[in-house]
Amino acid sequence: MAVVVKLSGRIFEDEELVLKYAEAIKSYGVKIAVVTGGGELARRYISAAKRGGASNTFQDLIGIYASRLNALLLISLLGDAYPKVPTNIEEFLEAWRSHRVVVAGGFQPGQSTATVAALVAEAAGASVLLNAANIDAVYSDDPRKNPKAERLPHLKYDEFERIVRSSSLPGGYELMDVWSISILRRNCITVYIFDGRRPEHIGAILRGENPGTKITC
Amino acid sequence: MAVVVKLSGRIFEDEELVLKYAEAIKSYGVKIAVVTGGGELARRYISAAKRGGASNTFQDLIGIYASRLNALLLISLLGDAYPKVPTNIEEFLEAWRSHRVVVAGGFQPGQSTATVAALVAEAAGASVLLNAANIDAVYSDDPRKNPKAERLPHLKYDEFERIVRSSSLPGGYELMDVWSISILRRNCITVYIFDGRRPEHIGAILRGENPGTKITC
Amino acid sequence: MAVVVKLSGRIFEDEELVLKYAEAIKSYGVKIAVVTGGGELARRYISAAKRGGASNTFQDLIGIYASRLNALLLISLLGDAYPKVPTNIEEFLEAWRSHRVVVAGGFQPGQSTATVAALVAEAAGASVLLNAANIDAVYSDDPRKNPKAERLPHLKYDEFERIVRSSSLPGGYELMDVWSISILRRNCITVYIFDGRRPEHIGAILRGENPGTKITC
Amino acid sequence: MAVVVKLSGRIFEDEELVLKYAEAIKSYGVKIAVVTGGGELARRYISAAKRGGASNTFQDLIGIYASRLNALLLISLLGDAYPKVPTNIEEFLEAWRSHRVVVAGGFQPGQSTATVAALVAEAAGASVLLNAANIDAVYSDDPRKNPKAERLPHLKYDEFERIVRSSSLPGGYELMDVWSISILRRNCITVYIFDGRRPEHIGAILRGENPGTKITC
Amino acid sequence: MAVVVKLSGRIFEDEELVLKYAEAIKSYGVKIAVVTGGGELARRYISAAKRGGASNTFQDLIGIYASRLNALLLISLLGDAYPKVPTNIEEFLEAWRSHRVVVAGGFQPGQSTATVAALVAEAAGASVLLNAANIDAVYSDDPRKNPKAERLPHLKYDEFERIVRSSSLPGGYELMDVWSISILRRNCITVYIFDGRRPEHIGAILRGENPGTKITC
Amino acid sequence: MAVVVKLSGRIFEDEELVLKYAEAIKSYGVKIAVVTGGGELARRYISAAKRGGASNTFQDLIGIYASRLNALLLISLLGDAYPKVPTNIEEFLEAWRSHRVVVAGGFQPGQSTATVAALVAEAAGASVLLNAANIDAVYSDDPRKNPKAERLPHLKYDEFERIVRSSSLPGGYELMDVWSISILRRNCITVYIFDGRRPEHIGAILRGENPGTKITC
């Protein structure tokens, strides 16, 4: 069983959390491809670049470099990961053939790391994508504003896409975007969205549980 | 003045047309970045791959290889183009610094060549993108079905996006997609859509004319 | 047992045939290195390039790109092939160490894909090269012109080279050239030439049969 | 005149400072090679890696990635810098031939960025290295502990090396190490050490002033 | 005027000679592409490899590495050469666009450096190839054996090819082979063969003289 | 058990010796990383470069190319070595994951091959480094000058470093330098220094003997 884990860049703000994710990944014997976001590091550097007049292209490249630094940190904590951070899908494919774990950051400007995670899932032939997100599940509305917002443990892709397009979901773009959704949907990949502060959910999901939201086609 | 020219892959079905585009590009002294689609060649190979069970990832890679073959053909017809086909935005940036003309195909799965053209325009700091398309202009409706369809020589991005989202525009995805539109819009790049069978329109546009549709922010 | 299969580019004109070759390669458990020619695709693009004044260097590079597109198509149809198209012999060697199947196109201008196949056979330590050719066997004369032309099921390298040098053999250069012959001969690699429209001959040859011509040192 | 500027990684903690250095580099028309350290970013990530049991090799690679992120940020703020971060001296040489400004981070484990700056100075044929340091000059003793410490505006390499070897100099290793000193000395490169919080000192030094310490052979 | 200079590897046995060639290349302001052979260094290493059972592939690769070491030495003696040794024709093309001098060694197994020189001449659009050879001119027969051997200052390609094919020419294969001859002939490149121990002949040839043998189409 | 073997470049002056080392490496089933020096070949080429005014950077690069030619020769004599010469630590790490034997030369200017051997030992997680040196053991003084010099079969790192820093040890820099010593010490890697003309000592050391000097932390 091959799974893809998308780690929100925010996880890398918390050293403890990164170490726990490394432990989790080491402990489960499945083939795992991890995609890391750039997080606060990326935002900080992009903000400085923007202030100084950098082009969007360079802002994107900076975000990618930040995500790769996060990826390399995770690699350094694992024993058997491919020792480099692949920079495009062909490098990923090559590494995936002979390593149990491969960790990537961004690939190219114009693609969010959520999209990269979806492309990696497609390339890896993974049937499952675990999204360690900034929210603990998908809700019908922003639970921080609307106490009546309904927690949605199961969604079909159509429903999920509708919610993502609306602006009521916190995390918005960083959770998923319509592009990544379309790639995942066309391969009928099941997505689990769970609270990124809870690495133990990876084990729970691999055992068949659903600690957050499960999206199917 | 730096311009980007997006050449629909269909142009490469017609040897005469390719030769004329080469002549046009050689004759105008401006800095030009060209992005070539995969065309019928890509479609044919992708169809064979699909039949044989190839993954979407490989189908995309095949389309990219086809677009790069088209790009190389064009390079071979120009005297002063960067002699290689850049495979990502950093290679493009590097080549663009020291060559008047750079010709690219696709970069990575998950990005249409329309998106690549938009990213290249952004990276090149181009103010204008010329789209040698499969239609001669943008219409309010499909002119082949509705004789009353109105030819639209000038559009704002909002209007253009609305039309693209609707299914009434022939060419649809291959013309532009919402992703490329958003990249172009955020850099306020002017887009000219014209009949790809008329290479002479490049000169017309450079002279300030508008033979098809002009889209501005 | 490691074998090399040289696929004439013409095979890629026929979708059915490509799919059958993929099946054949998947079914035999031996280590296989495949080298694909550029075929009609290459000829068409080279012709356009030549018309437009492209240098011989670029014409050769175009032929190489075409052969690599064919190679990638084949890779996409196999499950366990090295996922990239090696571009030189060192990349081939690296891939060959850890993959059952590796598919290459051309390497460098100045080398026919027949020569590349010979170099790959040498590098792979293969004892056998299967040439899926445009003719079904080697004849003493062009059988299409001379009905008395003798079919030659067994040849020594000397005899084969004499026939290749003479102009009576259809296919001529695309079959083999003196350079590839000398590389094969110095490693004493056995060559089987068979009808490229008959993928089932691969299995026959692996079972010890000789459906066309067998060349030994 | 070609100069090398070594920017302590700490500069990248201060967005204002980075923007000012970008302005300074843009304003002086000389050929400039910049080498950026990893700073606090590197230390933070290396510390996390170390906690999790990462090898020294990976700790070094993480430091290098951090320094390259800093380098890329600086590149994004300049208009005419080589658009990539060279990863070794040959890439640097290639970029240096055709760009006024090149910005590098670390190259390989086992080399401090101070050493990289020295190697780059040697490769670039620079006669001057400007070290934007964590101290404002070299002192005979640690001025923070010994109020009688003497500020040393001029030093010969011998004297400087003696001071670096002793532990009384704050900044120690990050300022310079004996390896970088030997490389600089053998090429008789003049080093200016100045307060890294004062980008305007670059201009002063280029005008012939000495705001901190000047080291000559 | 662009010229290609082929330097026999034997030149690199003589330090004085290498230094003189560097001076010659520096002094003439024309665009020069140099291709260096592996010489005695290659022969010694290949012999050791062969003794130890190395494959032909590796023997060829060793010869290529040796030729590249020679190339790098020459680069180090020139001020404005492309700072790297291109490893294939595309790298050569890229370097040739922006450097007055480019120095290459071998490219791939299966190609003599004479062939590489011919391919480089074709790619560079050079009209002239200067072959600093192991003989001082072409003779009708081996002058060391037949005192009546006629020195041939002018030859057409047909005549030259006939002589090369016969075994009477000393140097034989290392001078030129039929493959390089065919590439040179199809581009109508003029070849000058002269005594490799006389670097001053380069200047003579550039001035219109013919110190050895001149071959034209 | 993973070991690193550092082969002095002088070994490559003696064809017999190289063949014996190849045999030794093939016969022991352990994972071995080999680092080869440039030897006399490097010295000869560097001397020529220096005479002609080459920069230190190019002198170092020439030394690296020479060491890589030696590495390739050794690779060609082994059956299962990674088929390429890694050029930096990341390439080494990648190769080391899937090959029993990897052979490298130098990586970057500014690092002796002794330092590269130490970095490779650190990256490979090796506990032992075997240094096939130009001396048969470490002595308290130069045994060629002082007949009373004491042979030292066992040393701690402190003692060894003291001896290396003093000028009394023949071989000096080429044996080890303080930089490599510090890398080895921080990983507590045991070093065996033995007579490089005696390949059979590798087997002896693997069997637990100490034919020369053993250095521990």
From Swiss-Prot, chains A, B, C, D, E, F:
Signal peptide: none annotated. It is an enzyme of class 2 (transferase). Keywords: ATP-binding, Cytoplasm, Kinase, Nucleotide-binding, Pyrimidine biosynthesis, Transferase. Its EC number is 2.7.4.22. HAMAP family: PyrH_A. SUPFAM superfamilies: Carbamate kinase-like (SSF53633). It catalyses: UMP + ATP = UDP + ADP. Belongs to the UMP kinase family. Its main location: cytoplasm. Catalyzes the reversible phosphorylation of UMP to UDP. One of its GO terms (molecular function) is UMP kinase activity. Inhibited by UTP. Pathway: Pyrimidine metabolism; CTP biosynthesis via de novo pathway; UDP from UMP (UMPK route): step 1/1. ATP binds at residues 6-10, 39, 43, 134, 139, 142. This is Uridylate kinase. Homohexamer. The keyword Cytoplasm applies. The gene is pyrH. Pfam families: AA_kinase. UMP binds at residues 38, 60, 107-113. One of its GO terms (cellular component) is cytoplasm.
